[in-house]
Amino acid sequence: MQQETTDTQEYQLAMESFLKGGGTIAMLNEISSDTLEQLYSLAFNQYQSGKYEDAHKVFQALCVLDHYDSRFFLGLGACRQAMGQYDLAIHSYSYGAIMDIKEPRFPFHAAECLLQKGELAEAESGLFLAQELIADKTEFKELSTRVSSMLEAIKLKKEMEHECVDNP
């Protein structure tokens, strides 16, 4: 019994060390990067086809298999957002943002979720961050336009709310 406990503890320590050292569950199970890419393509295509629950399952598995690939968390967040699971989507986007701090889509999509929840100040903060991350990157020109439009809409909504309070 004592030996079993010691073996389990040693295994847990070895696993923790492996994961902290950059290892993934995919590596442990010898799942190739090609296989992960095929799964990603499957999930992406399911998402694009509106099969959010199916895509969600695959993205969730991908996040477990390789918790370092931020694309998987972007996909997971997008599925959750499409299914109206805004809090869970925000969690996915937040984790992805930690993995890729220069990716403006994470704060942008989190802001969309926050807007759906009616949390204007928090959404505005996310949009400002997205705007800052976009800077003058040409590949995010369309996203930049959307961010600007959403910030303007929030500004107008705040002004309307102020007018309603000032002029009841």
Swiss-Prot record:
Q: Which InterPro entries match?
A: T3SS_Ca_resp_chp_LcrH/SycD, T3SS_Ca_resp_chp_LcrH/SycD_sub, TPR-3, TPR-like_helical_dom_sf
Coiled-coil annotation reads none
Which SUPFAM superfamilies has this protein been placed in?
TPR-like
Q: Which PROSITE patterns match?
A: TPR_REGION (PS50293)
- Would I find Chaperone among this entry's keywords? yes
Highest rank taxon of the organism: Bacteria
- Has keyword Cytoplasm? no
Alphabetical UniProt keywords: Chaperone, Plasmid
The entry's function note states: Mediates the negative regulation of the lcrGVH operon by ATP or calcium. Acts as a modulator of the yop operon expression.
* Similarity-based family: Belongs to the LcrH/SycD chaperone family.
The molecule here is called Low calcium response locus protein H
Annotated organism of origin: Yersinia pestis
